[in-house]
Swiss-Prot record:
InterPro entries: ZC21.8. Residues 37-123 are annotated as: Disordered. This is Uncharacterized protein ZC21.8. It comes from Caenorhabditis elegans. Residues 38-63 have a biased composition (Polar residues).
Length: 145
């Protein structure tokens, strides 16, 4: 019984959706026809045409008869905001000078920083790829304890 009620409800929802979509489509078709009818104007003369085409009359005119009235506006020259004797007030705002960049260690620097450091390893041991240094002041205090 419940399955039948559910199927009836689904059919009612489906019927409502179909009717709504078809009404929406019909409204869109009517609106587009109304807009397209406004845009097209046909050339009909009220005095009678006697079977002659209006385009044929227009084709008899030559290009010499066509005149163009072109009005070109001169561009306005904008004045500078500041006269020649007046200075720009924004240029008077004090700015901080940038500090020069500190020199970083170059590849050819002297070993002055390495003089204060001693290796953890004995002089005969070599560990490539590791930087194990400590200051000599610390190494002397550690060895005394």
């Amino acid at each position: 019984m419940e399955a039948i009620l559910k199927s009836i409800m689904l059919l009612k929802y489906l019927q409502f959706i179909i009717i709504f979509c078809s009404g929406l489509c019909m409204a869109l078709v009517i609106c587009t026809k109304a807009k397209s009818g406004k845009g097209t104007n046909t050339a009909k003369s009220s005095g009678g045409n006697n079977g002659t085409n209006l385009n044929a009359k227009r084709s008899n005119t030559t290009q010499d008869d066509v005149k163009f009235n072109l009005n070109i506006k001169n561009t306005e020259q904008k004045r500078d905001e500041f006269d020649d004797d007046e200075e720009n007030p924004l240029a008077k705002i004090p700015t901080k000078a940038r500090l020069p960049k500190k020199d970083t260690l170059s590849k050819t620097s002297s070993n002055s920083k390495m003089d204060r450091e001693a290796s953890y390893f004995a002089p005969n041991e070599k560990q490539t790829g590791k930087s194990c240094y400590m200051s000599t002041a610390m190494s002397t205090t550690k060895t005394t304890t």
